[in-house]
UniProtKB/Swiss-Prot annotation:
GO BP terms in the entry: response to antibiotic
Lineage: Bacteria, Bacillati, Bacillota, Bacilli, Lactobacillales
Gene expressing this chain: cat
Function: This enzyme is an effector of chloramphenicol resistance in bacteria.
Keywords (A to Z) from UniProt: Acyltransferase, Antibiotic resistance, Plasmid, Transferase
UniProt protein name: Chloramphenicol acetyltransferase
Amino acid sequence: MTFNIIELENWDRKEYFEHYFNQQTTYSITKEIDITLFKDMIKKKGYEIYPSLIYAIMEVVNKNKVFRTGINSENKLGYWDKLNPLYTVFNKQTEKFTNIWTESDKNFISFYNNYKNDLLEYKDKEEMFPKKPIPENTIPISMIPWIDFSSFNLNIGNNSSFLLPIITIGKFYSENNKIYIPVALQLHHSVCDGYHASLFMNEFQDIIHRVDDWI
């Protein structure tokens, strides 16, 4: 997958990038997403919620270059043409999780089938990362389906160059005849500001509302 180099000296975000990268400023934001219509449609069609949410997340991420901006293995700043999800799968027997990645696809059915194939092959492997090699252009997505939360923060203390988003989903709950799910977004301030966090959440809510258009 193509990694497009950003020439820092000519980048219009240079001052912001250097300031927040040197400070190592990361932040998280959590929003309750209305999945009332989404959950009903997913159930009617016979699909699982988790991969359907992953698909919607990746549609937002791959639509916006800012969420694909990072530093590659050669320590170069740039952005990927496309990112793939690296998601957690829980093993009830071992009470541990596995991280599996699946190729992103704009077609929901294609992505869903690829997800199911990867899940079948790797979900029972007692390894943290059973599907190898893991491509550089992946972002972490996880779900904590046992609890809903109003905030969530995940820090990477030994990798100061990890700039890509980290997304965590919680347990859905009902309130006032609506169904909500908490979504936490962890961002590096060197590449993403509050505007971009809002952009992600608003576009994610929009694609969830428009489930009829893509499922």
